[in-house]
């Protein structure tokens, strides 16, 4: 499920909630998945895994969903520690224009602290995943971060 859940992004791109509404993204994504997988021997079973992930009703789908969100948190933290985020030049970034995001950044949070805090509030993390996210937020995770 984790290996294939972003297959749609090969067609529609990695669209965020700041770029497109959830319903439209789901419709575009499902159409893209059907097109990509049509005619493949395992196409239907892969399609069902993707749709199961999107619905997040099974324990496996919920686990995969939280893993996906946590991976984004950890990657954001690594980017921050490696100096890949410049908060002074975000004019074209729709995320940085969001009122909640602006408020979190104005409070002095780094980009990754903002992203993780926003994600925890928005995605209603399972307590175990929230604990891992908090650990990543409060501790360096890259060599560069450890040496600061």
Explain the meaning of each model-derived region.
Residues 1-148:
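Alpha-helical, largely C-terminal catalytic domains
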């Amino acid at each position: 499920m984790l290996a294939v859940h972003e297959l749609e992004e090969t067609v529609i791109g990695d669209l965020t909630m700041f770029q497109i509404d959830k319903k439209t993204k789901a419709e575009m994504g499902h159409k893209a998945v059907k097109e990509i997988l049509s005619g493949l021997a395992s196409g239907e079973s892969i399609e069902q895994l993707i749709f199961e992930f999107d619905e997040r009703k099974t324990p496996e789908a919920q686990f995969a969903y939280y893993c996906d969100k946590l991976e984004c948190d950890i990657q954001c933290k690594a980017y921050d520690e490696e100096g890949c985020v410049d908060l002074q030049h975000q004019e074209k970034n729709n995320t940085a224009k969001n009122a909640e995001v602006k408020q979190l950044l104005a409070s002095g949070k780094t980009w990754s602290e903002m992203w993780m805090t926003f994600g925890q509030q928005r995605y209603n993390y399972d307590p175990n995943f929230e604990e891992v996210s908090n650990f990543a937020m409060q501790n360096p995770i890259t060599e560069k971060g450890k040496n600061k």
